[in-house]
Structures are given as C-alpha cells and as structure tokens.
Amino acid sequence: MSHDSVWNSRPRTYGKGARSCRVCTHRAGLIRKYGLDICRQCFREKAADIGFVKHR
C-alpha cells in the first residue's frame, strides 16, 4: 500500500480537513463567518470586492 492511498484512505466530511478556501483551496486560516469560507490571505485581497470596509 503506497503512502498516497494511506493518506487519502477515507473522505473527510468534518473537521479542518473537510474545509478549504473557495478561491485558492488552501486549508489553513479559513474565515468561515457569514459563510465566506475564504482563507485570510485571499480575504485581504478580495475584501473590498466583497464589500468589507476597514474602519481604522
């Protein structure tokens, strides 16, 4: 059994492994609030396009 088949031996349906950024498919630093599901790096790039405004 190869390493790849052991690593992906079952589908991820819950937890951090099940969620990824909808822009770049990155798994760390996800912003899930309001159903965004975007990593923080992509959020900084796309925040103005989405409609978020920095107040300070």
UniProtKB/Swiss-Prot annotation:
Belongs to the universal ribosomal protein uS14 family. Pfam families: Ribosomal_S14 (PF00253). GO terms for biological process: cytoplasmic translation. It comes from the Eukaryota. PANTHER family: 40S RIBOSOMAL PROTEIN S29. Binds 1 zinc ion per subunit. Zn(2+) binds at C21, C24, C39, C42. One of its GO terms (cellular component) is cytosolic small ribosomal subunit. InterPro entries: Ribosomal_uS14, Ribosomal_uS14_CS, RIbosomal_uS14_euk_arc, Ribosomal_uS14_sf. The keyword Ribonucleoprotein applies. This is Small ribosomal subunit protein uS14. GO terms for molecular function: structural constituent of ribosome; zinc ion binding. The gene is RPS29. Its cofactor is Zn(2+). Keywords: Metal-binding, Ribonucleoprotein, Ribosomal protein, Zinc. The keyword Phosphoprotein does not apply.
